[in-house]
Swiss-Prot record:
One GO term (biological process): bile acid and bile salt transport
Periplasmic side: 38-387
Family: Belongs to the membrane fusion protein (MFP) (TC 8.A.1) family.
Transmembrane feature ranges: 17-37
Subcellular location: Cell inner membrane
Protein name: Probable multidrug resistance protein EmrK
Gene Ontology, cellular component aspect: efflux pump complex; periplasmic side of plasma membrane; plasma membrane
The organism's place on the tree of life at top rank: Bacteria
Membrane topology: Single-pass membrane protein
One Pfam family here: HlyD_D23
Annotated function: Part of the tripartite efflux system EmrYK-TolC, which confers resistance to various drugs.
Ranges in the topological domain labelled Cytoplasmic: 1-16
Source organism of the structure: Escherichia coli (strain K12)
NCBIfam families, alphabetized: 8a0101
Length: 387
């Protein structure tokens, strides 16, 4: 009886292990099939970081800082005034430039008035010469007849020569003044144009005492302080556009065989965890490894060289809508997974092959409309250049 029970136990145990083996086989087979169909073409790296533009804010003119409107982490819009400089010196310089323009216009305007004056003098000298010539021609036969003395004729001849010289002098003076004017309008005279440009430059210098944000974003790296004297080109702070961000994923060179531009990428951040998945696209593959572009690149010609698998940065775009819902910060750690399974991989470019016709980034906030000062310059010229 005990022998029968023992045999039953061994039989049940064999059935259990057989069933377990079948279950494990099915599980491993399913896992392998899933890996073969879905995960085999996935490459992943946790050596990935958020990258973005940190637009530097610098002064274009020198001056003392009177106002700092924002501090780090503040949100600003494109065109907002970030820093203001003292306007006293710039205002004085602009007023001087306007006064100088008015004086130059008045001085140049005299050339046009002198043109009329010289023209009248030429006409008068020509009349005098014509009268002297006629007088001399009348007296020549009279002198031959002895009606008048030779002395009187010589005096008439001297008058003719003198009037001829006066006419030539008047013509030369007229031509010299005409050469200065050269039939050019007053507002196009070189000295007037130069003074007008100086006025415009002074006006621009005054406008640039208000330093504006070129983009919409967040303040970072603020270093400027009220009372500080800044110079052109000095860095004051940076503005980070929240929507101009992407991921640089550093993949091993052995992983890049089937990576192509346009492939989909799933990205997980350490900030939000696995519950938030960002969806991106491969937009570019760097033309060198990170080590190749370092400040001190490796010298592999040395005798103690050790081969190390290199990593190549792959640029991955981010969905702007997802960025708005879950904002990221520059430098955050990410995990990027590229789906390299694509039947048209042969038609997908490994490197960019087209030239982009549109600029990558633009800002209208830094373009200053000069129409107000141009109108004012035109008024100064017209008011001081009345003929």
């Amino acid at each position: 009886m005990e022998q029968i029970n023992s045999n039953k136990k061994h039989s049940n145990r064999r059935k259990y292990f057989s069933l377990l083996a079948v279950v494990l086989f099915i599980a491993f087979s399913g896992a392998y099939a899933y890996w073969s169909m879905e995960l085999e073409d996935m490459i992943s790296t946790d050596d990935a970081y958020v990258t973005g533009n940190a637009d530097p804010i610098s002064a274009q003119v020198s001056g003392s800082v009177t106002v700092v409107n924002h501090k780090d982490t503040n949100y600003v819009r494109q065109g907002d005034i970030l820093v203001s400089l003292d306007k006293t010196d710039a205002t004085i310089a602009l007023n001087k430039a306007k006064n100088n323009l008015a004086n130059i216009v008045r001085q140049t305007n005299k050339l046009y008035l002198q043109d009329k004056q010289y023209s009248a003098e030429v006409a008068s000298a020509r009349i005098q010469y014509q009268q002297s010539l006629e007088d001399y021609n009348r007296r020549v036969p009279l002198a031959k007849q002895g009606v008048i003395s030779k002395e009187t004729l010589e005096h008439t001849k001297d008058t003719l020569i003198s009037s001829k010289a006066a006419l030539n002098a008047a013509i030369q003076a007229y031509k010299a003044n005409k050469a200065l004017v050269m039939n050019t309008p007053l507002n196009r005279q070189p000295q007037v144009v130069e003074a007008a440009d100086a006025t415009k430059e002074a006006w621009l210098a005054l406008k640039r005492t208000d330093i504006k944000s070129p983009v919409t974003g967040y303040i970072a790296q603020r270093s400027v302080q009220v009372g500080e004297t800044v110079s052109p080109g000095q860095s004051l702070m940076a503005v980070v556009p929240a929507r101009q961000m992407w991921v640089n994923a550093n993949f091993k060179e052995t992983q890049l065989t089937d990576v192509r531009i346009g492939q989909s990428v799933n990205i997980i951040s350490d900030l939000y965890g696995e519950n938030v998945v960002f969806h991106g696209r491969v937009t570019g593959i760097n033309m060198g490894t990170g080590n190749a572009f370092s400040l001190l690149p490796a010298q592999n010609a040395t005798g103690n060289w050790i081969k190390i698998v290199q990593r190549v940065p792959v640029e991955v775009s981010l969905d702007p809508k997802e960025l708005m819902e879950h904002p990221l910060r520059i430098g955050l750690s990410m995990t990027a997974t590229i789906d390299t399974k694509n039947e048209d991989i042969a038609e997908m470019p490994e490197l960019a092959s087209t030239v982009t016709s549109m600029p990558a980034y633009t800002s209208k906030a830094l373009v200053i409309d000069t129409s107000p000062i141009e109108k004012e310059i035109s008024n100064i010229i017209s008011h001081n250049g009345q003929l």
